[in-house]
């Protein structure tokens, strides 16, 4: 991380604007993890959709939701195309809440308790220092969504850490998220084609960790980007057989496309040197 901080010093990349967690999966039964500021909260942008994906599969597995074509379409659009509208629809299904006009105080309390259903699920699994109860907004919250923002600081936004995100992605990769079958279904949605001619430079497969990958690499990922942050949560398989989860969060450098690939490149070089 020192190298990345030094390289991007002219861009005023500060130590508190970068967080990274790396999980070596050479032996999936004995993963080795290292992190830099891995427990620090950051607004996750669309990386939060990874948590909603797992929650949807848990609800389906438990019979809390009916598996419909529309639900499947929304899951696909949330992960593959990162659509906020699809995510909002799934948050409604997960929590039994909807956006809309302001509510009376007692109704708002009930609404907010229901909205925290996903938080309670991840807390039951031992996840800490995260908040997963907000829809990703395009223009901002209104009505009861804004009511809940005002009443719930410091949890007025979604929050994740790179450690928590890496843990979840690792569980998906190793078939431990909900079930092996459901983890495999999640992996299908997260699969990217990092080859140069497979899409535009701005999509999730080409504008983040993928920029550092050598030919022949395989990538599964969920990126997040908005005005104040740029993140990527990636699982990579290199041509030499090395496998790792790499989660990189950057804050206040949303338009700096080179920071995440620079971190990934250092990791790739280290893992590529292995025999």
Task: For every predicted segment, state its role.
Residues 1-4, 12-17, 115, 157, ...:
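Structured C-terminal helix/loop/strand segments within mature extracytoplasmic catalytic/sensor domains
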Residues 43-65, 78, 246:
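Active-site SXXK
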Residues 26-28, 41-43, 84-86, 96-97, ...:
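Solvent-exposed loop/turn segments at secondary-structure junctions
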Residues 15, 70-150, 158-163:
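Active-site-adjacent helix/loop patches that line small-molecule binding or acyl-intermediate pockets
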Residues 1-40, 266:
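Beta-lactamase-like hydrolase cores
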Residues 13-18, 31, 37-39, 43-47, ...:
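Extracytoplasmic
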Residues 54-62, 92, 167-174, 269:
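Short glycine/serine- and small hydrophobic-enriched flexible loop segments
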Residues 58-76, 87, 179-183:
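Short, well-structured active-site flanking segments
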